[in-house]
């Protein structure tokens, strides 16, 4: 089984307590964990001007692509906040999809840049997850 972690790149660069460093991220990546973008500094993208959004999306992707030798494909919007401008900028910066915090199963009907998801918490059991999947078609 694999997992994906979403990285706020400036936090990892600063080596904040309880935040993965890039050395730790590389070690985990070598074991099969994947890493995607959660911006540079975790702003409210819906309230940010287009220049700030562009910087957050582009710079985070560039850092992850370079440091992890990968093509970062997914932007995970901080606090699930985004706008039509955000989605367009994500696409223009080479992201293939965007994840929201809207609870539910992802559907192409929602568009690739506004995908729902089920939140998995440390307390989520297999039974909880199955029940959530059955109630959120």
Which residues are covered by each model-predicted region?
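Substrate-binding clefts and substrate-entry loops adjacent to catalytic sites
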Residues: 36-48
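A cross-domain feature marking catalytic cores of carbohydrate-active enzymes
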Residues: 5-9, 37-39, 79, 117-119
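Short histidine/acidic/glycine/proline-rich micro-motifs that form metal-
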Residues: 10-14, 44, 81
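Residue-level detector of anion-binding/catalytic polar loops
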Residues: 2, 34, 96
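Ser/Thr-centric signal marking residues that sit
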Residues: 2-4, 39, 86, 100
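C-terminal active-site subregion of NodB/CE4 polysaccharide deacetylases
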Residues: 26, 30, 46-137
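Active-site beta->alpha N-cap acidic-glycine motif
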Residues: 1-31, 63-66
């Amino acid at each position: 089984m694999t997992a994906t972690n979403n990285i706020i790149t400036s936090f990892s660069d600063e080596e904040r307590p309880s935040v993965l460093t890039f050395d730790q991220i590389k070690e985990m990546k070598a074991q099969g964990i994947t890493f995607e973008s959660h911006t540079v500094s975790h702003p409210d993208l819906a309230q940010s001007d287009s220049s700030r959004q562009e910087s957050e999306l582009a710079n985070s992707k560039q850092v992850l692509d370079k440091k992890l030798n990968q093509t970062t494909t997914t932007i995970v919007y901080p606090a699930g906040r985004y706008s039509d401008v955000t989605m367009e900028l994500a696409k223009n910066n080479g992201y293939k999809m965007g994840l929201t915090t809207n609870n539910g199963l992802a559907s192409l009907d929602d568009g690739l840049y506004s995908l729902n998801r089920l939140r998995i918490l440390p307390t989520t059991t297999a039974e909880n997850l199955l029940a959530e999947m059955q109630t959120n078609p």
